[in-house]
Amino acid sequence: MLRQPRLWLGTGLIAAVVSMLFALLYVGGNVNPKGNLRDLPVALVNADSGADAGGRHVNMGEQIVAGIQKTAKGDKSIDWQIVTREEADKLLGRGKVFGALVIPRDFSATVTALGSPQPAPQGKAARPTLTVLTNQSAGSIGSSMSSQAAQKAAHAASAQIGQELLKQAAAQKTPLPAAAQLGLADPVNVTVADGHPVGSRSALGLSAFYYALVLVVCGMLGANLVNSQVDTALGYLHTDYGPVRKREPVRHTSRVRTLAIGMALMLGISLVMGTLVEVATVTILDMDASHLGLLWLYSVATIAVVGIGSLALFAAFGTPGMLLATIVFVAMAVPSSGATVPLQALPGFFRALAGFEPLRQITEGMRAILYYGAQADAGLSRAWASMGIALVAALVFGFAVTRLYDRRGLHRIPRPAAGSEARAETPEAPEAPGTTGAEASATA
């Protein structure tokens, strides 16, 4: 057996393609996020009301915004969205931005107080503050990238303001102590806070992705189980129980009917699997979750749609359909889901995949349920719509292909001809005593 070249070539070719494909997809999508970063959405809030200094009204917040916009023209990695604080909170609460830089209302007043000819006593002067907000619910890596960009912009603004304050101090008659000059060189205090906190048992904002991945895997495994069980019941496959092999009598049936049976069975086990996934994660593991009824419905629907889609691929392509389902639902889906590395930090190929790959839509809907109060515009409505489209596409594709196979007589197990069935069913007449076979044939 091992001396047959076909065995080695066939197995080796499939293994080579699968290993190469998984390596290119998994590593290729995540190997250089900073180099691929483009248009990462970050909110920029200027709540500064300005202050009077030297006989004129100044607004340091507007100067910071102008400086950030000027820098952004040559650097397309960050998409700064200028909004109000209320709008920023809404965007953070829907996962539309990965973070924010907030300029407070009294920013100009505290800056001008530092440059006053009669500054407050040392240690009593309030330092101007810029606040960087993170958003782990939108993705920990994306939130980290947003925080780094916002802090970089805040420290650059602090250095620019410090230069102006030092110039003002140098123009005064009384020189400032060295410690005071050092404080003026970097006057702004940059603080980091959580813009949309998630629970302590939310895997740092990754629980939605892991939950969605479990649902997809359950759908695929369920489809494989259903496919093998239906084929076993029809007598197409045997079942091994240790050394014992069992095989049912062959039941000839159409491909369309076989697919319909499998899909109906998949719907039934989706109820069980979806329920047990929620029980395991929420009840046993105490994962942070709300809207438990909606979570259950979403889980069952996801497993059912993924399972039905996999069964359609199995029915259309046979054994290669199992490998194809793995590529569609896992190999291409995980790196393009945007759950770990944000879509804005992926190569263009993976951004295109994210437009239709199921795991991306499933994860967004799961985030909306777990983190964003099940808001429809936080990704939940898109997830339901995508799930409905995928279900219709799977049904149409699966039944169209199997019906075509049936009409062309491409049965999974060739059926015996009608004449041979009749001969098999009609017993032969016994030969008369003393009559040879040749004589019997001649008599007939």
Role assignments for model-derived ranges:
Residues 1, 248-252, 288:
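Helix-boundary and loop/linker segments of multi-pass membrane transporters
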Residues 6, 10, 209-212, 384:
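Alpha-helical membrane-anchoring segments
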